[in-house]
Amino acid sequence: VAIDPVEKKPLAEWHPGSRVLSVGSYGCNMRCPFCQNFEISQEGASGVPWREVSPQELVDLALDCAERDSGVIGIAYTYNEPLVGWEYVRDCSMLAHKAGLANVLVSNGCASAQVIEALAPFVDAANIDLKCFSAEGYRDLGGSLEDVRHTIAVLGTSETCHLEVTTLAVPGVSDSEDAMRKEAAWLASVNEKIVLHVTRFFPRWHMTDAQPTPVATVMRLADVAREYLPHVHVGNC
């Protein structure tokens, strides 16, 4: 649990300068070899320090933070993959809305249609990781491109949710200009107001022998995306 600027989620175009109470746990439903936070996402209960916080306790904590800091506007479900415990996110989000707090979801988007449609009414802003734009690539990572596309389509067309999407430009996985062109065109077909982040990969977890993505590659992919989307940002450069 920590207070973070919204830009750290990252959310570049939603309540800039504001802060959220960020909460996370352990575990993930994907196994990306390039995971940037594998220390918690790939661990179980015995691998990380944790404590139980009820939904009401979390909302009360957020309200206390907001009372002491007017810049705190809500709760972000983040760090590991929040949807592995989606019922907790749902219960917290419902209570947060009743208390006048905003909800931010930072997720890989790999969840069933029923889960996303149950959560969508309570999500005010989201950043969804779009790991690559290949069904085969997603299978290699233990996920489903179809599920992630559905999540993006639901949140991207919601009248109450601001959506940003992040693609980490991993060498040999998601650094193809052709794939980025297809991805950006599809995102624009959902909603051209979707904000896209193209971020630079650094060696992590099972890809420590890889080289960081060249900055020029990230910039080139962002330029390709801008052919379709007006709101494109680069990160880690």
Please report, for each region that a protein language model flagged, where it lies by residue:
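Conserved AdoMet/S-adenosylmethionine-binding subsite of the radical SAM
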Residues: 55-210
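A short alpha->loop->secondary-structure connector
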Residues: 40-52, 98-99
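Electropositive phosphate-/nucleotide-binding environments in soluble metabolic enzymes
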Residues: 26-29, 52, 56, 145, ...
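N-terminal [4Fe-4S]-dependent radical SAM core
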Residues: 1-24, 38-42, 65, 69
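Cysteine-centered iron-sulfur cluster-binding motifs in ferredoxin-type domains/subunits
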Residues: 24-35, 81
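Short, conserved acidic/polar surface loops in the N-terminal third of protein domains
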Residues: 32-37, 44-47, 87-88, 116
